[in-house]
Amino acid sequence: MSKYQIDIEINSASQQLPSEEHIRQWISTALDSQQLDEAEVSVYIVDTDEGRDLNREYRERDYATNVLSFPADIPPEVEIPLLGDLVVCAPVVEHEADEQHKPLDAHWAHMLIHGSLHLLGYDHIDNDEAETMEALETQLLARLGYADPYDEASYPEAIPTNPAPRRQASSSAGHIE
């Protein structure tokens, strides 16, 4: 039995979702990096409209983004292993993987590790924080057999993961308008 409780709810029509086993493996890899005794994380996989609604409501940004992290707000004196919730917008992850010529499973792994690290207190607001977080993401992904997601040379010959025509995206990375 795992020391982590990872609940997964899918509200997406995507036919390209990773298995629940992979989702749990990727999140557990991030949690293991912090040597936690136990943890609870909820993962909610959504489509573009819901992703946009949540991003607008909680971040005041009117577009769907790849992953939203909602750390649990539990007082320190309450001993509950709840870390928080992750919301992943499947169409955005698929679009980004295609646009960046990355294998879809590698990008899913990256987004779930990235979101999990946010739940663990990591951030990328300033350059030092970003370097620390990106280095840990790269290390964890390498442990899983994936290339450095920040090194474009890691995917020079990659075949686009989505054979469908590309969607129109704004110039900002990480979202679909």
From Swiss-Prot:
Q: Where is the composition biased (Polar residues)?
A: 168-177
The answer on whether this UniProt entry bears the keyword Membrane reads no
Which GO cellular component terms are attached?
cytoplasm
Q: Which residues bind Zn(2+)?
A: 114, 118, 124
Q: Which gene encodes it?
A: ybeY
Instruction: From the UniProt entry, list the residue stretches annotated as the region Disordered.
Output: 154-177
Role played: Single strand-specific metallo-endoribonuclease involved in late-stage 70S ribosome quality control and in maturation of the 3' terminus of the 16S rRNA.
SUPFAM superfamilies referenced in this protein's UniProt entry, alphabetically: Metalloproteases ('zincins'), catalytic domain
EC top class named in words: hydrolase
Tell me the disulfide pairings in this chain: none
Q: What name does this protein carry?
A: Endoribonuclease YbeY
Compartments (UniProt record): Cytoplasm
What family is this?
Answer: Belongs to the endoribonuclease YbeY family.
BP term (GO), one: rRNA processing
Q: How is the cofactor bound?
A: Binds 1 zinc ion.
Kindly state which keywords UniProt assigns to this record, in alphabetical order: Cytoplasm, Endonuclease, Hydrolase, Metal-binding, Nuclease, Ribosome biogenesis, rRNA processing, Zinc
Q: What is its EC number?
A: 3.1.-.-
Q: PANTHER family annotated for this entry?
A: ENDORIBONUCLEASE YBEY, CHLOROPLASTIC
Q: Per the annotation, which location comes first and is thus the protein's main one?
A: cytoplasm
Instruction: Fetch the Pfam families from UniProt.
Output: YbeY
The answer to keyword Hydrolase applying to this record is: yes
Q: Which Gene3D superfamilies match?
A: Metalloproteases ('zincins'), catalytic domain
Which top-level group of life is the source organism from? Bacteria
